[in-house]
């Protein structure tokens, strides 16, 4: 068995270390039968002879042969390092040849690559879990917000699909008389089935795109342009994946939709009568509307949030959150606080809805067209203006805003709250 001094000397020569400036911080007693290829040599590139010294305390771990085997006996030695001031500290590990840091008191023996692989698998698993929690936070936000504002959503659709021009109170009375209270939640299940995955993907895509843009730019904070680009990309991504459910919901709410037999019946009817691509009616105006809608919605919210967090009050709140940490309840862990989160969410939603509402009207009309009488998006827009003038493009804007204000406020609040509860790690 080789002595430690001989092993260190050979290791120094093999590592081409500077004797005047570097020192070996670990070693192994090895039997001759154990090949050197199975050992990852540990050295400290940051510890010099002048500034560090070995502690008198060293930890030893002895590995014995298994019964009935002839595996070599070897002994690992872990040496800790002290600063030049003489205070003893335990070593936190040293950089091995495999490129990552070993744990304190450990020596890498033929398992460097395996440990690296285990760490990679662990990181991938943690990333997948974080993504799942992120998606659930967005989905739960959509379910809560849509259920709360389902009656307003129903009235908005009545204005768009039927071209209602009457008094809002008269519309409420008619729905209550003909369909009862449950009529205000008509189509809410399919609405949740549509909006839950939509908002889930939308929120997650925005945070992901924003984080990637931040990494590419190398800035400390996301710029307003990056926020708008990330929001637009998130809107397009969610629209491409979720438009079919939105089309089915619109058909169910339209006159005669009750006879189709629910979501499955409406889906089967559209496939049989108009083909699969009928589920993507209004795709172009949907993409055209969702790109600016997502840009405005997420951009405005993030701009307001960033502006507040740079104020003295915002900085003080962040500092307080950092000091208290997990001792704060979930509401107090919201960076903006409950009320400001609701307010900024409502403002962002109102700005987004007002900016893109005409595209929404055109898209709904396209979804209602039969295959034989289908018009292009431009032709549909022209027809709407011819029949009711430019104000027709904003038909139902008031009930829509009444629906969007609480919806956006609740949605953003629940989303931020669930991220705290589920301990979602930020992408940016």
Swiss-Prot record:
Query: Can you say where in the cell this protein is located?
Result: Mitochondrion inner membrane
First-listed, main subcellular location of the protein, grouped into a coarse class: mitochondrion
An example Gene Ontology cellular component term from the record?
Answer: plastid
Query: Where are the annotated Solcar repeats, by residue?
Result: 129-212, 222-307, 336-421
What GO biological process terms does the UniProt entry carry, in alphabetical order? transmembrane transport
Q: Quote the Gene3D superfamilies the UniProt record gives.
A: Mitochondrial carrier domain
What membrane topology is annotated for this entry?
A: Multi-pass membrane protein
Q: What is this protein called?
A: Probable mitochondrial adenine nucleotide transporter BTL3
**Phylogenetic lineage:** Eukaryota, Viridiplantae, Streptophyta, Embryophyta, Tracheophyta
